[in-house]
A protein has these predicted regions:
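Substrate-binding/catalytic cleft of secreted carbohydrate-active enzymes
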Residues: 139, 149-258
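Disulfide-stabilized cysteine-rich extracellular repeat microdomains
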Residues: 97, 121, 246, 262-263
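Single conserved hydrophobic/aromatic residue that forms the stacking wall/gate
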Residues: 1-11, 256-266
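Secreted/periplasmic carbohydrate-active enzymes, especially glycoside hydrolases
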Residues: 5-156, 163-164, 169-172, 194, ...
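Active-site loop signature of alpha/beta-hydrolase-fold enzymes
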Residues: 119, 179, 263-266
Length: 266
């Protein structure tokens, strides 16, 4: 969903994986369903290239995704070709989210953010946290700790956790992997690739309101972070970017007496 195209429209970019370079032909069928499974729209498009872009517009009575009423819609995609049939189902929500000098606004309404960092590790099982535990963590953050935003410290986290955040209305600040270190050019190129992989995997989650494109608590590096920001905004023009810098090795360290981190928005 693209905010700039209006909350009543859906803009879809579907990329087809074609490693064998087969001749492209056939049809793509898209069905949009509401939270009760009712079909709101059915569209059919001819396949002529690996990237297919289309719009479903003039939708009426659309309900917004919000932290108190996280309404989700489903877009079912079928690809029918001479080589077979494939399908994909994605949930999403209609919402706008924006950080301004006057604060954060969700669907045009001011919202004071109360958030925590979250690692998806657990005693005895490490990072191999299953679906039910991922769900439970999201619920603890939302209902027991009463926060409205979670920062994925410091890496993209399980799809099960993000799915539950979508379902219960918990906002997400999702980060690329890393902590206090910036490596050489090869390392930096891999981090930029991580930005792309994170966004392309998770861009349909309405809970995600901010892409974290800085290595956590890392020193300043204008060239590197210009590239991570450019990658994020090229892939997703609907979300802002952010990150956490390390003051003691940053440009503004003389202005502070501690090495506390500061959140940045770009």
């Amino acid at each position: 969903v693209e905010r700039s195209r209006g909350l009543g429209d859906v803009y879809k970019r579907q990329n087809l994986f074609n490693p064998k370079k087969l001749t492209l032909s056939g049809f793509l069928i898209a069905k949009l369903k509401d939270t009760n499974g009712k079909i709101l729209s059915t569209s059919k498009f001819k396949i002529t290239r690996e990237e297919i872009c289309f719009e479903i517009d003039k939708l009426e009575n659309i309900k917004l995704w919000d932290i108190d009423n996280p309404v989700l819609y489903t877009l079912d995609i079928w690809v029918e070709t001479p080589y077979g049939i494939d399908n994909l189902s994605e949930r999403f929500g209609f919402r706008s989210a924006e950080f301004t000098k006057d604060g954060f606004f969700l669907n045009g309404n001011p919202l004071k953010i109360r958030g925590l960092n979250r690692h998806q590790s657990f005693p005895y099982i490490g990072y191999a946290l299953g679906k039910s535990a991922q769900y439970k963590d999201a619920e603890i953050l939302k209902y027991d700790l009463r926060i409205n935003l979670v920062r994925t410290s410091h890496y993209p986290q399980s799809k099960h956790f993000l799915n539950r955040c979508d379902e219960i209305g918990l906002l997400v600040f999702e980060e690329i992997a890393g902590w206090q270190h910036i490596g050489d050019k090869e390392w930096q190129n891999k981090s930029i690739e991580n930005v792309q992989n994170m966004i392309e995997r998770d861009w349909n989650h309405p809970s995600i309101i901010l892409w974290g494109v800085r290595i956590n608590e890392s020193p300043d590096n204008h060239e590197f972070y210009l590239r991570t920001n450019q990658m994020a905004h090229r892939l997703d023009g609907t979300r802002q970017t952010g990150g956490v810098r390390k003051f003691i090795e940053g440009e503004f360290c003389l202005l502070y007496t501690s090495d506390a981190a500061d959140d940045l928005l770009c």
